Amino acid sequence: MLGYVEPPYKNIGLVPAKADDVVNYIPARLSALLMLAAGGLMGLDTAAGWRVFRRDRRKHASPNSAQTESVCAGLLGLRLAGDAWYHGVLHKKEYIGDASREITHEDIPRVCRLMTVTALLALLLSCAAKLPFAL
């Protein structure tokens, strides 16, 4: 499968995975900053979001994956990631964020709202960037 860097897909997955890392390097970081701003608009703990982002944004095999995940964990006071099972094999991974509280089912709509506000900020930023060229 494209994007997989483990056997038996390594021969066809390594180049697409690395290309994805390069192409999404800036968008991942911009998205993290937009998510932090969205958290501020929603009254979430932006200081914790920034602190966890600075500390945990590199705690993933992909250089881009933990960017927004770390902001989200900090904003909501959650501990995310950690060990995971893939295809019957346990992969030991670092945690992202602090376990300030237990994850509950109420966190699902909170994260959905956070993602929606982040996406709206991205849309506004895109429109603002395009506006000078439209005139």
Predicted segments with their positions:
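Hydrophobic alpha-helical transmembrane segments
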Residues: 3-135
